[in-house]
Amino acid sequence: MNLENVTYKDTTPFVPPITGGKVIKVYDGDTLTLATTLPFEGSPMYRFSVRTKGIDCPEMKTKNANEKHCAKLARDMIKSKCLNKIVELRNVELEKYGRILADIYVDGVDVKTFLLDANLAVAYDGGTKVTPEDWLVYYNLKNA
């Protein structure tokens, strides 16, 4: 196959061959940015936005005050656990919108467990989202 004849259906999405890196930014509870190199000699230091596989957190960009409050709690929890730390990525793939999706481990612990245990995330498999009617009520079930 040459480039002149290639079509979209002849290609596969590129999944960066990354297995970990240093967390340099936390956007929200389930999205962070890593600094890492690719596995070839002389690779520059790249940054990748990575979404945590298997969960959905409250959204930062919402008009709902309770959801935004819980989104900030989730973000701050992940910042405290992960920011400026080296993390390991497992099961790296692309999700339906082309973003990197992975299981993210810090100090041997899957970071999604912190959020699920605190009711700051719900399980999510990429299909239809089922989220709490009120994130703050859901959070307070375990944290009141």
Outline where the language-model segments fall.
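Small beta-barrel nucleic-acid-binding modules, primarily SNase/OB-fold domains
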Residues: 1-144
